[in-house]
């Protein structure tokens, strides 16, 4: 978000100016920790100097004893800094298969988006630092692979129609601590970070806390230099590659992939192109949602693009396929010798017929 784009004209001139009551609003997501309190303090100074309102939103996850008090203290500190409005929201965290950390993150973003929409904020600022970026890269490598794992967190992104920005990705946690000390800003240290624990953290601590407390320091001792900065710069470069690959894949997907509502049964149709199949498979005898992938179009692309197109298409259809399943579908494109279809989650399957790969939940339909 470029604040200069929403700056009130009079604030470009010297002198004291009051921020208008209807000026654009930016919200700082604040947990009360050192990073978010530093961001709140600096954001208020910068926004006020540009005629932009600066508020805060505090999300109480209710997962720790005393969380209500922590949220209240964070809100009071933000008000003391001059931020307004200061919004406190209570999140409902329901951990399912994704784990407690992921469920808490989803609940937090739900509340941040709701607060932004209700207040009319033009953006929500997040206090992730260079250290957080390095931790994210390591977690990505542990849980995933490829350029997406290396790309870390984007500086600006949109979620549920709300713009989020991370202004502190070039600052370290030591620097945000210094900002708080220089400005006399008090902050809260989350006990789940394990800062006060001697030795390795137990396995029941959050993965990010263990990476921060144990893994990153061990790598730094081994490497003999600031690996957080190294990982963060690697993430920036990998994100540029990822954004290009995503853009190119989206272009190819728009030409090669069609999402369709298939009937349970229909007369035989031409299978030379995905759009021909989609047009022919229409009647009122029932349907299933699926994909048609044009082999001739996608086969012209390099493997990196083909795999990305297949993965993105399946994701949009609600199919969370593994890397092995995506590679098997790619073999239907470039190594077709009459092999059988590929079984996918949620009862889906992918089958090739002439120059089209059909992905649907009705295996018999896909094999017609």
Segments and roles (model prediction):
Residues 1-216:
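Core alpha/beta nucleotide-donor-binding catalytic domains of modification enzymes
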Residues 177, 183-236, 240, 309, ...:
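Mid-to-C-terminal catalytic subdomains of enzymes
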């Amino acid at each position: 978000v470029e604040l200069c784009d929403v700056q009130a004209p009079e604030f470009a001139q010297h002198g004291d100016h009051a921020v208008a009551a209807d000026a654009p609003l930016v919200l700082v997501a604040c947990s009360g920790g050192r990073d978010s309190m530093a961001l709140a303090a600096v954001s208020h100074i910068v926004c006020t100097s540009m005629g932009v309102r600066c508020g805060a939103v505090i999300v109480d996850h209710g997962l720790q004893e005393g969380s209500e008090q922590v949220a209240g203290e964070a809100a009071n500190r933000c008000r003391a800094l001059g931020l307004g409005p200061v919004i406190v929201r209570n999140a409902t965290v329901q951990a399912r298969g994704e784990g407690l950390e992921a469920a808490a993150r989803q609940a937090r973003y739900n509340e941040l988006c709701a607060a932004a929409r209700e207040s009319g904020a033009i953006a929500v600022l997040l206090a992730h630092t260079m250290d957080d970026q390095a931790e994210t890269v390591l977690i990505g490598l542990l849980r995933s692979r490829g350029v997406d794992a290396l790309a870390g967190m984007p500086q600006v992104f949109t979620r549920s129609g709300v713009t989020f920005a991370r202004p502190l990705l070039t600052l370290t946690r030591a620097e945000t601590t210094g900002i708080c000390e220089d400005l006399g800003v008090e902050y809260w240290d989350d006990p789940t970070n394990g800062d006060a624990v001697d030795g390795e953290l137990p396995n029941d601590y959050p993965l990010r806390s263990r990476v921060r407390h144990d893994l990153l320091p061990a790598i730094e001792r081994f490497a003999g230099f600031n690996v957080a900065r190294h990982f963060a710069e690697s993430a920036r470069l990998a994100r540029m590659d990822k954004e290009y690959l995503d853009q190119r894949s989206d272009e190819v997907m728009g030409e090669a992939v069609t999402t369709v509502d298939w009937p349970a049964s229909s007369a035989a149709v031409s299978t030379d192109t995905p759009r021909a199949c989609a047009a022919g498979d229409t009647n009122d005898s029932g349907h299933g949602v699926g994909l048609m992938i044009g082999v001739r179009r996608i086969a012209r692309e390099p493997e990196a693009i083909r795999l990305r197109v297949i993965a993105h298409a399946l994701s949009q259809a609600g199919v969370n396929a593994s890397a092995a399943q995506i590679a098997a579908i790619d073999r239907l494109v470039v190594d077709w010798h009459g092999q059988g279809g590929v079984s996918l989650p949620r009862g889906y399957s992918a089958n090739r017929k002439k120059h089209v790969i059909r992905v649907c939940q009705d295996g018999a339909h896909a094999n017609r």
